[in-house]
């Protein structure tokens, strides 16, 4: 259970208010107008943006001051955040050890993650040798290998075509179901919400509203 308790998140002159609770093993779509604060919300959850006030609780424990790497979550970015000079194996391995000194067991975990996202035999390639969809799969493998209970996605597949984006959404949803991770996904696409979301967090007017059932909200949008 992740709770933002009467939180204020400030970036420059913008302040976002949030008072909400997220349950395990659910998929949340974060929607709202451009500039409403959707990415700001994810940044605060991950620890990239400090709370001005309020608390962030995980399973009842206050993690407001925890460093990003010490939080029970990982994030998948729109640009995949891959290092061009590193191999696929190394890019995924960063999720386990930033110094890339991977032991045998850790190397096995990386290969298993690559296999699970359909990148068998590509561990030695560089990102420039991969298609856009394959690069997205490398980034997803790095998320998978960390085995965190919360996965945050900031429009990670926005640059992909509709068919490939749907494939990636289905893969993310399947992996989350297997690992019982909660997904929190920023999206501008209503079809993405309908495809995989259980709940919707609507962000507008400086407020991230508590989750609502996705089907009901999409049938009666605000």
Residue spans for each PLM region:
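A short, proline-enriched helix->beta-strand linker immediately N-terminal to the Walker B motif
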Residues: 145-149
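Conserved ABC ATPase "signature" region
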Residues: 104-122, 173-174
């Amino acid at each position: 259970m992740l709770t933002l308790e009467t939180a204020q998140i400030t970036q420059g002159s913008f302040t976002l208010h949030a008072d909400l609770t997220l349950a395990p093993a659910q998929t949340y779509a974060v929607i709202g107008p451009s500039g409403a604060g959707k990415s700001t919300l994810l940044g605060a959850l991950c620890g990239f943006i400090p709370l001005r006030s309020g608390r962030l609780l995980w399973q009842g424990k206050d993690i407001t001051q925890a460093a990003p790497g010490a939080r029970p979550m990982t994030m998948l970015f729109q640009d995949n955040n891959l290092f061009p000079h590193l191999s696929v194996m190394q890019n995924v391995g960063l999720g386990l050890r930033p110094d890339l000194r991977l032991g045998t067991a850790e190397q096995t975990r990386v290969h298993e993650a690559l296999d699970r996202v359909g990148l068998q035999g590509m561990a030695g390639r560089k990102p420039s040798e991969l298609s856009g969809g394959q690069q997205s799969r490398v980034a997803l493998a790095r998320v998978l290998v960390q085995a965190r209970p919360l996965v945050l996605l900031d429009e990670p597949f926005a640059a992909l075509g509709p068919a490939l984006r749907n494939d990636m959404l289905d893969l993310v949803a399947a992996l989350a179901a297997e690992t019982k991770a909660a997904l929190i996904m920023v999206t501008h696409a209503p079809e993405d919400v309908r495809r995989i979301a259980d709940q919707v967090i609507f962000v507008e007017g400086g407020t991230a509203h508590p989750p609502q059932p996705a089907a009901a909200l999409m049938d009666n949008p605000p």
